[in-house]
Amino acid sequence: YSAGLPFPLVDANDPNAALKVMWNFSYRPLYTDDAISKNTEIASYRPGSSPADPVEHFTIGNVGFYNNIGRTEVNPIPTDPEATRANIRYRFGAYPFLEPSEMRGFGFIRYRSIDPKIEDNSWMMSPRTRHTRRASASELADVFGLLDAAAGGGNGGAGTYASNLDPDSFFGFAAKIEDFNYRFLGEKPMLAVVHAENSPAKACPNDGGRTICPENWEMRRLYVIEADAKQTSALGSGPTIPKRIFYIDSEGWFITASDQYDRDGKLWKTVATFNAYRDRPIPDARVAIWPFKRMFQTALVDEDVTNGFSTVVLSPGVETEEHESWYINMGLATENFFNPASMANAAH
């Protein structure tokens, strides 16, 4: 594999169809080289709350990643030498958290290995101790573990922050492809947001603003894939979300929605993503202007269907002066950003 779509043609009758769809998703054209999203906002709501009164509101200074494989626009192309030198497929970072004030400075970094047998190397920055520590794969697969670490606990601390979203659900799914078994459930025409009208996204008036809904919904042909977590020692007793159903766009290869099941096999949460296709993230952009139209995520909603609690991710955010947000394949995500020492410095 060098770059582009690993499997341009997927036959539904192919016994490996599900795995091919997932690798197409993994190397999807949304962000091939690097990306930085500035001032990403995450807000959580209970039924009855409003956009003006969230249970919790987070702002992350920078969310970024750098791919070593499959690069198409920014040198080195198509493979960064680090891929073979360090066996790293890509790096991801989300830091520093700017609010709430007691979480200021929190963040995490993860490196994904090319080797399917090697789990992610991850680090978290504790706002309480002002030190970085290694994070386990199970913490990044569990929203409660992440919040515990954010509270400064980490294996025993008291996590007090309200959110549905776990790092493995970023962009619909961010866990290691090799850690799951996949089953092809079929193709279905379903509604999805691929050409979002609003960027930043607008809150839904029908549920008090707990989700996103006034959008340009359209019928899309989606692949439906079941993902079941393998039993690995890295995940301990198993992830809190052992089963997921993905609805993957057959043209853009991103996850439009995902149903998430708990350890008892019951539907627990559902995720919906909102995506746009344009040459700039906002109409009046001055810097983030791309040479051609790109797909990018404007929002993600992660809702607990058992109690109506929802978490909404906005990129661009609505409360920040930085509305351009998405800097895709512009070379802004450098190796230094993904250094745990840089994360520690940003927290001080």
Describe each region flagged by the PLM.
Residues Y327-H348:
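Gram-negative outer-membrane assembly/targeting C-terminal domains
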Residues P200-D207:
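Long, low-complexity, polar/charged, intrinsically disordered or flexibly structured peripheral segments
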Residues Y1-A3, A94-M103, G107-I177, D207-W326:
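Gly/Pro-enriched, hydrophobic low-complexity segments
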Residues A17, D304, A333-T334:
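Helix N-terminus capping/helix-initiation residues
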Residues Y182-R183, D264:
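Generic structural motif
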Residues Y1-E119, S126:
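Solvent-exposed N-terminal domain segments of exported/luminal and surface proteins
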